[in-house]
Regions:
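Short conserved loop adjoining the S-adenosyl-L-methionine
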Residues: 98-103
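Conserved beta-strand signature within the Rossmann-like core of class I S-adenosyl-L-methionine
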Residues: 137-144
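Short, glycine-/aromatic-enriched active-site segment of Class I SAM-dependent methyltransferases
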Residues: 145-162
Length: 207
């Protein structure tokens, strides 16, 4: 089996401009606005897997003290190109490696369309890291795809990206094991219009 992380990151390294353009074209406002219902104004916010910087820039514009990470250096370059206000807010980091931040450093942590790229064991580790850097009582919000019809037997899509598709109940169990208290969750269709791709978004409170 090829290295799932190297293969996934390599796609984003090679296709960063096109991937960033796709992300920028998607109206994600319904998700971010729903998350905003539960988070404090102008808090410390970490976005893990910021991609094109779309959401990080949105939160920055709303007055949050934003830190945004991504595993692809080329995607970070696109984020800065598209959103120059993110200068000084971008950090190169790859899960499931420990996040380079202190315990309880953030009021809010988001990870949209990230954790499903991790192996089963590493997703658990990553959720533990999200919990660690969130202050007690803080909010963790993340989305994952629960179904992708075009994966090969090893979990790779035609672009070489690796996915693990758990169902909503399995992710909920991982949330509980990570010490997260449920606040809100919802399922949704794919905003890019891909047939058969389904998503679930969780908003949790760190216990």
């Amino acid at each position: 089996m090829k290295d799932p992380y190297r293969s996934t990151i390599n796609y984003y390294q090679l296709e960063a401009p096109a991937a960033a353009a796709t992300y920028e074209s998607v109206d994600f406002g319904g998700v971010t606005d729903r998350v905003l219902r539960y988070i404090p104004e102008r808090g410390r916010l970490l976005e893990v897997g910021c991609g094109s910087g779309r959401d990080a820039a949105y939160y920055l514009g709303r007055g949050f003290d934003v830190t945004a990470t991504d595993a692809s250096a080329h995607m970070l370059s696109q984020a800065f190109r598209l959103h120059p206000d993110l200068e000084g807010h971008l950090v190169h980091h790859q899960l499931p490696n420990p996040l380079p931040f202190a315990d309880g450093a953030f009021d809010v942590v988001t990870a949209m369309a990230v954790l499903m790229h991790l192996t089963a064991a590493d997703a658990e580790t990553a959720l533990g890291e999200l919990a660690r850097v969130t202050r007690p009582g803080g909010i963790v919000a993340y989305s994952v795809s629960t179904n992708r019809p075009n994966l090969d037997p090893e979990g790779f899509d035609p672009k070489g990206r690796y996915f693990v598709c758990r169902n909503e109940d399995e992710w909920s169990a991982l949330n509980s094991a990570s010490g997260f208290l449920p606040v809100d969750s919802w399922t949704s269709r794919d905003l890019n219009g891909r047939v058969g791709v389904q998503w679930v978004t969780f908003v949790c409170r760190r216990g």
